[in-house]
Amino acid sequence: MKEVVIASAVXTAXG
């Protein structure tokens, strides 16, 4: 599920 990978990347970027 790419959505999970994207969500993880976004969370990291955001953080």
Curated annotation (Swiss-Prot):
Main location: cytoplasm
Subcellular location: Cytoplasm
Enzyme class: transferase
Domain of life: Bacteria
Keywords: Acyltransferase, Cytoplasm, Transferase
Catalytic activity: 2 acetyl-CoA = acetoacetyl-CoA + CoA
Gene Ontology CC: one annotated term: cytoplasm
Single GO term (MF): acetyl-CoA C-acetyltransferase activity
Keyword Cell division attributed: no
EC nos: 2.3.1.9
Subunit structure: Homotetramer.
Family: Belongs to the thiolase-like superfamily. Thiolase family.
Function: Catalyzes the condensation of two molecules of acetyl-CoA to produce acetoacetyl-CoA.
Identification of the protein by name: Acetyl-CoA acetyltransferase
Organism listed in the record: Clostridium pasteurianum
Gene: thl
